[in-house]
Amino acid sequence: MGRLKKRFAVITGGASGIGRAIAEAYLSEGAEVLIADLNGDLASQTAAELEKLGKVYAFACDVTKFSDVKALSDEALRVFGKVNVLINNAGLSGRGLISEIAEDTIDALLNVNLKGVIICAKVFAPILKNANDAVMINMSSQAGKRGWAELSVYGATKAGVLGMNRALAVELAPEVRVNAICPGYISEVGMAWRGWDSRSKKEGGDAGSIGTKFAIDNIPLERLQTADDIARSAVFLGSADAKEITGAALNVGGGVVMD
C-alpha cells in the first residue's frame, strides 16, 4: 500500500476493462486518478464506484481529437496541479484477413490505437517533463511483437506504439520514464473476440472451459491473464521500484512472447 503516493495519473480508456483495473489499483496504492473515456457517463459511473478508494475524477475525451486531449490536459492540471503519470490505455480490438478487413475498421484501429496514443503523448509530454520524475505507460500488445493471422492491422498499430515508446524514452529522458505493457490473452475480454463464445454453443460446454484448454495448450504458464495482472504491472512501472527502467516493453502474457 502507498507505493504511488504523490502520483497524479491520467488514464485514457479508464472506464472499463484494463483501464478500470488500473484506476482501481492506482487508487489503492495512494495515487489520485483522472479517468478519461469516450463514454463520459461510464467514466463518471466508474469514478463514483471507486471514490471510496481515493481521489478520482472523470472526463469525457475522444483521444483521436487534439482539442479533446488538450481539454483533458487542462482539466488534469486544474484538479491535480500537475500530472506525473500518463497511461495511454484507450484502444480498440479488431481482426480480419488483410484481403477482407473493412476500410472503416482499418481507419478506426489506426485512429484510436496509434494516432490517439501519439496525440496524448504530444499533449502531455511537456506537462510530464515539467513535473519531473514522471512516467508514461503505453498499452501495446503481444501482437505488436509477434505475427498472428487476422491481426495484421491491429498488430501494425501496436507495433507502432512500441516504435513511439522507444523513441520517447530517449526524447523525454531524464525527466520522464517511458515504458509499454504488452498484454497476453486477457480472459475478461477475449471470449467473444476469439470466437470462444460461438464455439462453445456449437460444441457444448462453456467459453471459459475452451479458454482454459487453450491456455494449457498454448501458454507456458498454462493460464489466461486478467485485467488485474495488467494493472499490477502498471503499478510497478509507475512506482519507484521501476526507477531505472525506461524504453521497455513488458510482456504480461504467461510466456507466449519471450524477448
Model-derived segments and spans:
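Substrate-binding pocket helix/loop in short-chain dehydrogenase/reductase
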Residues: 97-98, 102-110, 196, 215
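Short C-terminal tail/terminal secondary-structure segment
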Residues: 3, 146, 234-235, 246-259
